[in-house]
Amino acid sequence: MPITVEDFEAARPQLLSVAHRMLGSVHDAQDAVQTAWLRAAAGHRAERIDNPAGWLTTVTARLCLDELRARRRRGEAPLLADAIPAEQLSADEAVLRTENVSRALLVLLEQLTPPQRVAYVLHDLFAMPFDQIAQVLDGTVPSAKKHASRARRRLHSPAPVEARRQARQAPDREIVEAFLAAARTGDTREMIRLLAPDSVRDADAALLPPGARTVVTGATAIATETVRFADRIRAICRLTVDGAPAHLIAPGGHPLAVLHIGTDRGQVTRITLRPVRPTDVFAAV
């Protein structure tokens, strides 16, 4: 029985979710799903397809695996947010919010090998059996399990001992989180209360609009300026960066900037913002 348009439309939301977790891009996910449908619609398959959704998922996953491997061959580093067209970035951000996708997880998935990412996404996020995953990877069940296990260890292994110590001993973490909460909602009064009167915000010029000051001093000035960047603050997740705890601004799950917030005596004293570097290594806190 051939796959019908109705079969495809019923499966499309799941296919897009699977492809997005694998590729990290709504645009690329849509391409993979559309290609899977074109292959199904070509009608060259003689055998009966009893599970259209399963067949489409397998084909989509193979296409994603091919794309991930092609990226590796081309030597492509994960795209940083400032290298992605605004329309595509908005689409990626919308998926994170509407589907409640972990921003930090999407960042960390970029550090897996293609087989590890496919095995982890299919099994741990979408509960696909390993015998089917082995078919996608063109390997054995034990090898598929090994890829998923290695992905798990990499994604969920504890941060370095020093990073965990720093995270535990980070002064006034509640103050930092309260400041970020106020920044997300544009609450200038609360930000001013949490900022020290002589606080300093130091940002790389590459992250600011042309002509904006790289250094801003004073609670009122910092709070007023921070309101302009509330959308970026809403795209924050907490990770370790090169072994040290930090906040990462990652619109749509694509890294943009590393944010460090210093405190003293219950107030925010310094905010430092720098662009993400291709050599940065991220890990769960």
Model-based region annotation:
Residues M191-I192, S199, I261, G266:
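Hydrophobic pocket/interface hotspot
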Residues M1-D31, T35-V176, D187:
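Active-site-adjacent scaffolding segments
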